[in-house]
Amino acid sequence: MHSWIFIHFTVQSYKIIPGITPGITESETGSRRAGRLEKEKIRRAAVLVPLIQKGGEYHVVFEVRAGSLKTQPGEICFPGGAVERGETPKQAAVRETMEELLINRCQIRVIAPLDVLEAPGAMEISPFLGALQGYRWSYSEAEVDHTFSVPLRWFAEHEPERYETELVTVPEETFPFEDVPGGRDYHWRRGHYDVYFYRREEGIIWGMTAKILRSLAEMYREDILSK
């Protein structure tokens, strides 16, 4: 048992965790890095927030998803999708942007990663801020109905509407309630999740897209408009 512990949890050979081996300090342990439980259940996705220069200022490019798609047809979003096996979130964001906007890799400059979002349904979304060079409003008709742009400044000057949703736990029918204190009356924790809406003449920008925009707009407002 001791050999397993020092192989997995300590830096120095033949030493185990503090309290078991005399004289070991906490700084001498800790070679193991924390992983993530049930990571195989987490769906990973990545999106690119594409910027273009238009009229002397930055615009954000949006897609309207094709009506023929099974998921979220007609919704406004950023180019992006699932992170495939063997690729990084950044690579996924670039690949999806190339496929959906029909542009080349040399037309995309990834500027920086934005804050990762954890969405309901065990989904992790990695957004990246990027700049498009020579974009001519092309898109894949199989995935996109049309594209449009909105000045980034507009989002910095307009706060989105915020609505709160409640997340509840619903056990499956075969759940062994008899083994849980309180049975079917067990008090499950409830979560709360904010949903944002931007209302534009082009359509409603909401959900994860709006949440990413809100975060980007705050940075833009603090770094640019406040100066």
Which residues are covered by each model-predicted region?
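N-terminal leader/linker segments that precede catalytic domains of diphosphate-processing enzymes
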Residues: 1-77, 82-127, 131-136, 153, ...
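Acidic, glycine-rich loop-and-strand cores that form catalytic or ligand-binding grooves
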Residues: 139-174
